[in-house]
């Protein structure tokens, strides 16, 4: 735990409120963009936001009145029991939800959820959760408040700790304590909720029969209230909160989960098991009878060090339920936390600033939800996503290093098992129970799987479809079916669908899944994989520069030195030095720190050849000077071990556990909770074998006896490198506590003479999880097993630096050459072409096929400067990424210089890439089918209405789809405090010799699924990707495939064409795309070309080529016509290639900055050329020496390696 303990003062209050709002006082259009609601239900979820669903002064963290205790000699006095908590980030609309627009037009989602629930064997919410319940309807509440039921919306705002208590009817409405608050346009009535335990002194447990008015625990003289039970509200909490948790915990008895969580809320001292012993488990053939390979695949290897589990799956099932029980306890720890972050205020969102009118605000909101769809889709499309971790596997007993059996942290693990959910169920001993469910070998993704991961909640499923309907950009994986053709072609045929009719088929959930079927995950054998997690950056601090936390503050500061200010030490860190370099470049007008990924500002600086070369000289001088000074300070002043520090450097970032940072909508909050449950169970499962080791696990009392042991081992993992917590001392606001007077009942005003007593004064608050990635690959094979050594050898080949000639356009200055080609080389275009073409120009140059008379003296000088800069950079480069802007070039150049000073050699370093989600208007009719709202009567109507939607997108704020861009300036991307998706694998290990504490590391890993997850993903072991949806500048202010296989995709083909080069790369790419995509290529725009090429300038050229072909076609665009146009353009640009040149060819290989242009040409028509020489091929003179450095003086910087 942290040494510094913070004190926080919180107010006291009820466990929740019921808000009663008039419909006209709410911004229903904006609310609908953020809500979760299906078409067949009036129940809805809304985000907890100030000035949207709660008042501006809403207090999110408080001490909840959770019960009462008797005081005094005779027990006549009452002291209120107070428990810390924070409000749940979603609110529950249980009356009037019909006024909120559905999230998706997909019909009959409740039917789909019920069918999936029955198929997978999960319990339903049938009737009241307790006996003798008396319902309080929404209409009754409205009548009591003097409001019109038809014109009123009622929703519940409840604390995270007591939401299950509301479901179990252990609360009552205190009408005497209602008050009026102001939200948005009008006044809103809110009714506080208190627990019935307030009328049962000293009862610290869940009340199983709250409607029993003669309960013996009711205090003498107390007027017992009517507990609050509402059918719709209970269904909403059951389906959207408890059932998703039950799916993640592998517990099919959903009510048992609710009962256990509610009990823990009232009994803070309970440490034993809370889930019942009769839990059922999914039957499947465990692979622990075999052995575990390095990647987790099972094989029958007699030489393996793993042994089969002797218990026939009993220990696997025991580990599963004990890990689930531990996760419930962890949820209580999180729910009792006090967090400083408050719910966001929608009126303060930066993206709404300066906007007048409803349509612009809705357009901004629609655009941003399309951005969010990028990260939501990644969680759905990745097969190792936390959403799909529904089963536990046993990898078998692993022998210790001394040859004997020993406990292993890696024995039990979660894996993706939705395809197993329909299998029969077993009891704890493995006996198969009678069940209607049968397993199926079909692993094709279906709507049932979406319903499963949503906990069978129709509102969550509708909201998830809302995002999937916006996932369109970048699905260039081959075989992408045209959904429009599918719907129109099957309109008149009898296709059995339980969810839709003909006229609603375009918006059916099955149509959405069919459209995205190529991107949906496929599940198979149980293997250990990284966990795909969803989280939020709530801090602008991250170590995501190329060298991570190299030379950090904690190492540079001198222990015990009180004379030097901390700020002075900070200025000598790598992070601060890189920031100073960016400031210097900004002063030189080379960089805009507000938009470091953009190079548009260079257009005002680079106006001709001299300014271009001056930029290169300035850039090189600034970087070398800054790096030299930085290394000198580290060595001479800080006495920093530069080489050892490099081997210990890591990229790092923290994903917050703050409940409101990821609460943009109910689905983002849902994903945060699923991520928490996944990582908590991963840690708990790692300790199960240690608890089981040497014990008689078959005993009936084993679980109750050792559940507290597992819980304590889990809590001991806090602050061990992965989960960070902080101990907070809680104090109460001054004054008496306001609560209902038990002797007067629920209609009387609140009494204000009660004293309160906190159940826990010191609260452990879970803050964040830490993700790390080592910068340098060491290749050290010592102290490793044979399997690990073999895997490391395979990695070494991937990290091996390849010595090869650098293509200028793929080198350090490639982005500048593409951006300013038209300015620097206006004549650099193919014959019969009207626009300069950098690919054609530099291809001919590097093949020595460029006629010298086409180059001026200034152009030759610039070419020589570019060649020298590129080759000098390539000579020291250990980063397997070409820069795409000045900021990336600066940080890469500086990192390479530091690597040179540290004598780094042989291996490439690990690099980070951030995929930034964006938004665009749809252009393909197939991507707007789900927005057709008019009933269709024929197949022709579908296409007509789809095209009509595309013509009026500007007036339809919901018509946005996702797009992606990439940047290697990851720290700049993390400064926007984004919502992120990435893969992590949590390693566990003991400390130094004699230290039994278990430490962990959240290793930055990958998302399986490749380009199905994101079109910009590439298979490169040296790179780590993160998908980020920026929040800064939008909703918060900005201060200061399976792992072993890889499929060939269209993006791979395009990248292959780019790498192979060629004079007319654009034509080759365009033809390839048209052949692969077909008619969809007609609607492709800049975002699509960028997704394929990951090159902004090449994408712009392709967009222009696309427009040019459309204009030249005399008939409507067709695949055949486009390919014919490409062929004609190719013939025009290559015309004259067979002619024998009579002029001199420019010799690119021997070019150097020189005033004599004749030294850089080859005489290809003179007598020294043999008659068999093919015109245009490189034939250097015999006395030509490449890279003759004899006349170049050796430059010495201010510091050399000898000095170090």
From Swiss-Prot:
It holds the Pfam family Viral_DNA_bp. Residues 1177-1204 are annotated as: Required for nuclear localization. GO terms for molecular function: DNA binding; single-stranded DNA binding; zinc ion binding. InterPro entries: DBP_sf (IPR035989), Viral_ssDBP_head (IPR043031), Viral_ssDNA-bd (IPR000635). Keywords: DNA replication, DNA-binding, Host nucleus, Metal-binding, Zinc, Zinc-finger. GO terms for biological process: bidirectional double-stranded viral DNA replication; DNA replication. It is found in: Host nucleus. GO terms for cellular component: host cell nucleus. A zinc finger (unnamed) spans 497-510. A motif (Required for filament formation) lies at residues 841-842, 1146-1148. Residues 289-314 are annotated as: Disordered. Gene3D superfamilies: 1.10.150.560, Viral ssDNA binding protein, head domain (1.20.190.40). Its main location: host cell. Homooligomers. Forms double-helical filaments necessary for the formation of replication compartments within the host nucleus. Interacts with the origin-binding protein. Interacts with the helicase primase complex; this interaction stimulates primer synthesis activity of the helicase-primase complex. Interacts with the DNA polymerase. Interacts with the alkaline exonuclease; this interaction increases its nuclease processivity. Plays several crucial roles in viral infection. Participates in the opening of the viral DNA origin to initiate replication by interacting with the origin-binding protein. May disrupt loops, hairpins and other secondary structures present on ssDNA to reduce and eliminate pausing of viral DNA polymerase at specific sites during elongation. Promotes viral DNA recombination by performing strand-transfer, characterized by the ability to transfer a DNA strand from a linear duplex to a complementary single-stranded DNA circle. Can also catalyze the renaturation of complementary single strands. HAMAP family: HSV_DNBI (MF_04007). Belongs to the herpesviridae major DNA-binding protein family. This is Major DNA-binding protein. The gene is DBP.
